[in-house]
Amino acid sequence: MASHLVLYTGAKMPILGLGTWKSPPGKVTEAVKVAIDLGYRHIDCAHVYQNENEVGLGLQEKLQGQVVKREDLFIVSKLWCTDHEKNLVKGACQTTLRDLKLDYLDLYLIHWPTGFKPGKDPFPLDGDGNVVPDESDFVETWEAMEELVDEGLVKAIGVSNFNHLQVEKILNKPGLKYKPAVNQIEVHPYLTQEKLIEYCKSKGIVVTAYSPLGSPDRPWAKPEDPSLLEDPRIKAIAAKYNKTTAQVLIRFPMQRNLIVIPKSVTPERIAENFQVFDFELSPEDMNTLLSYNRNWRVCALMSCASHKDYPFHEEY
């Protein structure tokens, strides 16, 4: 199993990264330090997670202590929906860089295709609980992203939560300067995403799988929701390999040639999630896990379902 996938830019992106969505600010600095000490070199961040400053403290300590060199780290962040208007993109990126205490990002993604009304509120809602859109078009947002590459603020740019028609719209943009290097999407055995993954690969776009464990700590979880970590069928596969269910769920996307970014702030779990390079799921077990697809999403962003750029009305 390769430890990296190569982006079309030639950059090597570590196949396993530390996710930081829902990592509490008080715990994420330590999580980042532990992860780097354990060998993680890829950290996945976003402005909307409201913890980039604390992630940055962990990075800064390890860089200043010369535990790791900047060029050996792969740091990803994301442009939030309230900053899609072209004149806001650079400032948003600079805020993230300042918080992370870095002078460049390895990869910067448009977090969602949906633009929201600019302002301090990350989810501006109207009286009916629907998100208030902005006037932006993500193709124009993309042009501002391209400028960040030219200015040296970011090494590569990509998208997240885009369906294949939305990716296609960027690829077909007249005068496109840089195509998306990555599409970061939700992928796990209940949402296997075969069609979208196949489409991205056919265009030379690397796919990052988020919520590989089904994000059991998501704030909107309901008791009746399915649980990947508690699924007896997946537990049985894990037992066969002498591995935990989480390790099988992390290995599964890796063997599909996807990047994967499990989140944890618990040192033991951060270590456990990295112990996935010493076993291989059989083709039969891979197919079995794929067969559990039920098109179940952790992140459906239902408050945006009426937005013109909502990505999940399409099949893929």
Swiss-Prot record:
Amino acids binding substrate: 111
An MF annotation (GO) of this entry: allyl-alcohol dehydrogenase activity
This protein's record includes keyword NADP: yes
Active site (catalytic residues): 49 (proton donor)
Catalyzed reactions: an alditol + NADP(+) = an aldose + NADPH + H(+); all-trans-retinol + NADP(+) = all-trans-retinal + NADPH + H(+); 9-cis-retinol + NADP(+) = 9-cis-retinal + NADPH + H(+); 13-cis-retinol + NADP(+) = 13-cis-retinal + NADPH + H(+)
Site (Lowers pKa of active site Tyr): 78
GO biological process terms held by the UniProt record: retinoid metabolic process
N-acetylalanine: residues carrying this PTM: 2
Root EC class: oxidoreductase
Modified residues (Phosphoserine): 3
Modification sites for N6-acetyllysine: 222, 263
Top-level taxon of origin: Eukaryota
Main localization, broad class: cytoplasm
Binding site for NADP(+): 10-19, 211-273
CDD domains: AKR_AKR1B1-19
Localization (cell): Cytoplasm
Entries under InterPro entries matching the protein: AKR, Aldo/ket_reductase_CS, NADP_OxRdtase_dom, NADP_OxRdtase_dom_sf
Function noted in UniProt: Catalyzes the NADPH-dependent reduction of a wide variety of carbonyl-containing compounds to their corresponding alcohols. Displays enzymatic activity towards endogenous metabolites such as aromatic and aliphatic aldehydes, ketones, monosacharides, bile acids and xenobiotics substrates. Key enzyme in the polyol pathway, catalyzes reduction of glucose to sorbitol during hyperglycemia. Reduces steroids and their derivatives and prostaglandins. Displays low enzymatic activity toward all-trans-retinal, 9-cis-retinal, and 13-cis-retinal.
Similarity remark: Belongs to the aldo/keto reductase family.
The protein, known as: Aldo-keto reductase family 1 member B1
Classification lineage: Eukaryota, Metazoa, Chordata, Craniata, Vertebrata
Name of the gene: AKR1B1
